[in-house]
Amino acid sequence: MSAIPFQTIDWNQIIKTEHHGETGNAYWQTIQLGNLRIRKVTYTENYIADHWCQKGHIVHCLEGDFISELENGEKFSLSKGMTYIVSDDVSSHRSITTKGVELLIIDGDFLK
């Protein structure tokens, strides 16, 4: 990965893309810097991801709360100000929220 010069991100200027869950929707605002992806993601009320994700992430909860469920049945509750970290192909996981949540998600080759 090459050096990233100082820059600011005005999330109000980043286009939202819609992604359907098993229930509810996710809205992504994505910045791609080489192999580094930074997303501000909003899950609507009663959102359940439609797949088990195997990608590594750093996930920080900006607003609301959600459950990160692992494929082995473990569940972790996260709320505003909390973060989780997982590497690629270590723990398949999915997100669930009843009230909606706003997350900052960072992923890339550094999590392999």
Locate the predicted segments by residue.
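Short acidic-glycine-tyrosine-enriched beta hairpin
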Residues: 72-89
